[in-house]
Amino acid sequence: MSNATDPQMGDDDYDLNFTGMPPTDEDYSPCRLETQSLNKYVVIVTYALVFLLSLLGNSLVMLVILYRRVGRSVTDVYLLNLAMADLLFALTLPIWAASKVNGWIFGTFLCKVVSLLKEVNFYSGILLLACISVDRYLAIVHATRTLIQKRHSVKFVCLSCWGLSVILSLPFFLFRQAYHPNNSTPVCYEVLGNDTAKWRMVLRILPHTFGFTLPLLIMLFCYGFTLHTLFKAHIGQKHRAMRVIFAVVLIFLLCWLPYNLVLLADTLMRTHLIKESCERRNDIGRALDATEILGFLHSCLNPIIYAFIGQNFRHGFLKILATHGLVSKEFLARHHVTSYTSSSVNVSSNL
């Protein structure tokens, strides 16, 4: 997702570019942003916290899944790739945080590489969430093992998600460069010549469609039918499974839908499809800062939603601790018995 707040300005008197669109002589207007400094430091602290939490949580998820070589499920393969996507996404946050202080000082090459890495892992994460919803839909609604549920096919699906993510992200790698507007600090920005605003609209609409809207519709469709099936079926602990599924969709919506809506409003304003004013630019700039924080938070919430709630993850983590003598094997055995008697049909245990 094109991060409209990546190119942050310094402590200049005027806000030239806080929504990521360097001003031109035609559309420049001296809009002041009263909360610039406050927003800057709030975002830096948030990036640091998300980076640390995501690094810890997703590393643990990868450790547990890779440690469990026998009995690794289809969902585990998706979760492993999702953890990799979130972890790689989080690794770009320190660089973006540093750019909040003095602008983009890292040059064009790093601008391209870090932007590509950030975009690829954002989109791969969302596409993998959609794949998990399809996997749960097939397992619960159709209760059958289709080709997509075979391990080699799942690996192909994951590779396809990464490949599509690279394709969606290529424009940012090709067109982004270090850019130094007049009377302002340098930014990492897509430079497309005289038609920059028009092409930026295209660069936003295509990823919005294929990297957000379509995966979201797939998730809503699959989880909708999955919940309907669980309501009709007489399955033990089905309410627990429903809580996990609700968390999947609701957390995703809470984290990314607000940012995408505000980003759409910013694009419409910058292309003059809605009226532009200093007040509106300030409002959208503050909204982008706030909603971007929610979106970035999603990368460290995934381990909680998809792993820490699940019985299998907790048992796998305790098994690693027991192997290294950090917990007793008796405690591990008691936990395994409790997990087995309280879990339902793979619906919630995998999640």
From Swiss-Prot:
A Gene Ontology term for the protein's cellular component: external side of plasma membrane
UniProt keyword list: Cell membrane, Chemotaxis, Disulfide bond, G-protein coupled receptor, Glycoprotein, Membrane, Receptor, Transducer, Transmembrane, Transmembrane helix
Disulfide topology: C111-C188
Keyword Iron-sulfur: no
GO biological process annotation, one example: calcium-mediated signaling
Residue positions with a glycan: N3, N17, N182, N194
Highest taxon in the source lineage: Eukaryota
UniProt cross-references to Pfam families, sorted A to Z: 7tm_1
Transmembrane domains' residue ranges: 47-67, 77-97, 113-133, 155-175, 205-225, 244-264, 290-310
Family matches, as SUPFAM superfamilies: Family A G protein-coupled receptor-like (SSF81321)
Localisation per UniProt entry: Cell membrane
Record keyword Transmembrane present: yes
Cytoplasmic side of membrane: 68-76, 134-154, 226-243, 311-351
Membrane topology classification: Multi-pass membrane protein
Any one GO MF annotation of this record: C-C chemokine binding
Extracellular side: 1-46, 98-112, 176-204, 265-289
InterPro entries documented for this protein: CCR1-9-like (IPR050119), Chemokine_CXCR1 (IPR001355), Chemokine_CXCR_1/2 (IPR000174), GPCR_Rhodpsn (IPR000276), GPCR_Rhodpsn_7TM (IPR017452)
Assembly and binders: Interacts with IL8. Interacts with GNAI2.
Family: Belongs to the G-protein coupled receptor 1 family.
Function of the molecule: Receptor to interleukin-8, which is a powerful neutrophils chemotactic factor. Binding of IL-8 to the receptor causes activation of neutrophils. This response is mediated via a G-protein that activates a phosphatidylinositol-calcium second messenger system.
Protein name: C-X-C chemokine receptor type 1
Native source organism of the sequence: Macaca mulatta
High-level lineage: Eukaryota, Metazoa, Chordata, Craniata, Vertebrata
Gene designation: CXCR1
